[in-house]
From Swiss-Prot:
Pathway: Purine metabolism; IMP biosynthesis via de novo pathway; 5-formamido-1-(5-phospho-D-ribosyl)imidazole-4-carboxamide from 5-amino-1-(5-phospho-D-ribosyl)imidazole-4-carboxamide (10-formyl THF route): step 1/1; Purine metabolism; IMP biosynthesis via de novo pathway; IMP from 5-formamido-1-(5-phospho-D-ribosyl)imidazole-4-carboxamide: step 1/1. This is Bifunctional purine biosynthesis protein PurH. It catalyses: (6R)-10-formyltetrahydrofolate + 5-amino-1-(5-phospho-beta-D-ribosyl)imidazole-4-carboxamide = 5-formamido-1-(5-phospho-D-ribosyl)imidazole-4-carboxamide + (6S)-5,6,7,8-tetrahydrofolate; IMP + H2O = 5-formamido-1-(5-phospho-D-ribosyl)imidazole-4-carboxamide. The keyword Hydrolase applies. Keywords: Hydrolase, Multifunctional enzyme, Purine biosynthesis, Transferase. Residues 1-146 form the MGS-like domain. SUPFAM superfamilies: Cytidine deaminase-like, Methylglyoxal synthase-like. One of its GO terms (molecular function) is IMP cyclohydrolase activity. InterPro entries: AICAR_Tfase_dup_dom_sf, Cytidine_deaminase-like, MGS-like_dom, MGS-like_dom_sf, PurH-like. It comes from Synechococcus sp. (strain CC9311). SMART domains: AICARFT_IMPCHas (SM00798), MGS (SM00851). CDD domains: IMPCH (cd01421). One of its GO terms (biological process) is 'de novo' IMP biosynthetic process. One of its GO terms (cellular component) is cytosol.
Amino acid sequence: MAPTALLSVSDKRGVVPLAEALHRLHGYQLLSSGGTAKVLQEAGLPVTRVADHTGAPEILGGRVKTLHPRIHGGILARRGDPAHEADLLEQQIDPIDVVVVNLYPFRETVATPDVSWDAAIENIDIGGPTMVRSAAKNHAHVAVLTSPEQYDRFLKALSGSAGGVNANVRRQLALEAFAHTAAYDVAISRWMQSRPELQPDVEAAAPAEALPWLEALPLRQTLRYGENPHQKAAWFSSPMGWGGAKQLQGKALSTNNLLDLEAALATVREFGYGSSGLHPAQQAAAVVVKHTNPCGVAVGDGVGIALTRALDGDRISAFGGIVALNAVVDGPAAKELTSLFLECVVAPGYSSEALEILAAKGNLRLLELPPEAIDAAPKDHVRSILGGVLVQDLDDQPIDPSAWTVASQRQPTTAETADLRFAWQLVRHVRSNAILVARDGQSLGVGAGQMNRVGSARIALEAAGEQAVGAVLASDGFFPFDDTVRLAASHGIKAVIHPGGSLRDADSIKACDELGLAMVLTGRRHFLH
């Protein structure tokens, strides 16, 4: 009896060449359903439809096609087992040797921000995962393919082995199949948890540990290397968030590139992003990042002006940096981007003039990330620790100046209040202990990652230099002593903002009053580790 391959795919890339090779080179009979059968027949291949094979028509609008003993018996039967072979003979079931199935595009469907509950539910595959799991369970006798990326590898293994692919290949394919269905189920659960339609009573809610919070993610690409060249790395991503980005030019991405891009994007989104989506840009903004810390941030009348001001904040540190822009890159911005060596740029889009200019920098990585991809991404912040992960809410709540209090005798001026808000928006994106000096919508100096707060302040103030005179200073945590306030005043800082809450707050407030500084307390800390 000729071997049989069952093909039923949503992603039809490569399915015709695969079926041609199976049938014409290796003598497989082809069994298929629905749209896949139509594609194969149009390619001139002899196909038996599943409905003809089982004697049962597709019903319920296609919800039931392959859930039939003649399908699953053929997949699950152990070859050489007398009892199984007797059952096959009695029920007139033919063995199925290769199962090629990929699933309804659920993740792609729910990546659309306005997707309805019913539309998403209709894209939950039932028959597909059942066939995949059946074939993976019986991998001792059946090969299962769940992605077009596997086809060439499978055909190569098939050509190099008489009597079908060897057990090691089938075992590896089974592993990949179970990973595929696991990721699919977690994606469904994850999406349902996020929906307003699902509001269970407290008594009916499952324990938190029973709900999968982390979506199993498919491999997006193997990276050049990890944080260092001797470390291997890979990027796993859903179609949402960074998975929705398109790289327009440049070298392959590294781990550090993605970490810096993430930091830059989070910072520039403080000012909105793009012209569509949930939070469109209200003002053009630019961010330059090095080692996940912003070294230059600015707003301006146009993305080119914002970029120039951001780079001017610290052009020495900007060399080799990562840039995020919240508006379409135009010609002037592109010219500024070519003025120094940069690793990556991310923006919601690029004009044709900008792309022509930037093409001269062939190694510069240009990424286009639409606002809709950002809006659809999960809101959890996840980090790994040895043997586990930590999950927390993103620190992206809107800034609320109405919750602030002025602790000093002197009230900040209108201009100082605007600068304090700008600095407070940014300091939460700087590694603790974090200090940021700013004025007129431009960062002037950043102190990051020091083990004591006054050390970070010293770095930020020295970076700002003479521009610190009349500027403001923000701190992500409270001042444990009055030394930071006194240092700030000695450099000409006129107002400071911090969470407050130190046992020695009174000392810092007293120093502000002595030195004529305004002090604002926000009541909210913004540590970043």
